[in-house]
UniProtKB/Swiss-Prot annotation:
The gene is icmt-1. The chain crosses the membrane at residues 26-46, 53-73, 92-112, 116-136, 184-204. InterPro entries: ICMT_MeTrfase, PPMT_MeTrfase. It comes from Dictyostelium discoideum (Social amoeba). Its EC number is 2.1.1.100. It comes from the Eukaryota. Its main location: endoplasmic reticulum. It is a multi-pass membrane protein. S-adenosyl-L-methionine binds at Q149, H156, V157, L158, V159, Y164, H169, P170, S171, Y172, E210. Methylates the C-terminal cysteine residues of small GTPases and the heterotrimeric G protein gamma subunit in response to cAMP. The methylation is required for intercellular signaling and regulation of cAMP waves propagation. It also seems to induce the activity of car1, a G protein-coupled receptor which senses extracellular cAMP during the aggregation phase of development. This is Protein-S-isoprenylcysteine O-methyltransferase. Disruption phenotype: Cells lacking both icmt-1 and icmt-2 do not propagate cAMP waves in a sustained manner and fail to aggregate, affecting differentiation and development.
């Protein structure tokens, strides 16, 4: 079966999975995210005090939309409304809530803080992080999953080419940069520190857990790869 036939088959599987696994919910979420992207762009264009928030909102909605699109491309049989990663974890949801509260409190009481010109630095870094994560996911293809795999699939191979030559977990690196950058855009001084610490703690545990399984799956090949290539997260080998 050539590549075009595989893509066509995956499209059929994706459509079937979409119809079976919460088509209405997925449609509603997609619509909501699309509105969020449009509203964010409108704020950036027309608002003087909420331009940063507009970029943040558009970037946040784009992130979740892309996560869903990626699953339709490479894991159509696992497609569901959960593929948007909207309910990633209680910690992630709490961090988002705190960042929103911080932004609006500071916007109301210290409006000058939210018009500080460095928001564009965060925007550039956020786009960079999104691109790195997207490239990593595309390079890994079906070998990349949202959940840590505890059993090796027959088609699971060790990916060390492309961006994986330079870091073992480029998708985590991209997400780490992306998450901290969103708080730079919002000019949330407390959440910048909080997101950095929370993201590092999360990936520290996840990488250790994931690599235990990868060593079981690939043995010496992964051990050698681990020794020679950086993890992608500062302070984590």
């Amino acid at each position: 079966m050539d590549q075009s036939e595989i893509v066509k088959l995956n499209k059929i599987k994706a459509k079937s999975a979409w119809l079976k696994k919460g088509a209405a919910r997925s449609s509603a979420i997609s619509c909501g995210l699309g509105i969020g992207i449009g509203f964010g762009i409108a704020l950036f264009i027309f608002s003087q005090t909420l331009r940063g928030f507009g970029i943040y909102l558009a970037g946040l909605c784009t992130f979740h939309m892309w996560e869903y699109i990626w699953v339709t491309m490479y894991h159509p049989d696992k497609l569901s409304s959960k593929s948007f990663l909207l309910n990633h974890s209680p910690q992630f949801n709490m961090a988002l809530l705190i960042s929103f509260i911080e932004f609006w409190i500071e916007w109301y009481f210290f409006p000058s803080l939210k018009t500080f010109s460095l928001w564009w630095v965060g925007a550039i870094c956020m786009v960079f992080g999104q691109i790195v994560r997207s490239v990593a996911m595309d390079t890994a293809g079906s070998n990349f999953t949202h959940l840590v795999q505890e059993e090796k699939r027959d088609d699971h191979v060790l990916v060390t080419n492309g961006i994986y030559q330079y870091m073992r977990h480029p998708s985590y690196f991209g997400w780490f940069v992306w998450s901290v950058s969103t708080q730079v855009i919002l000019m949330n001084p407390i959440s910048i520190i909080g997101f950095g610490w929370a993201s590092w703690s999360f990936f520290s545990q996840r990488i250790e857990n994931e690599e235990d399984y990868l060593i079981q799956f690939f043995g010496k090949s992964y051990k050698d790869y681990k020794k020679s290539v950086w993890s992608g997260i500062p302070g984590i080998h």
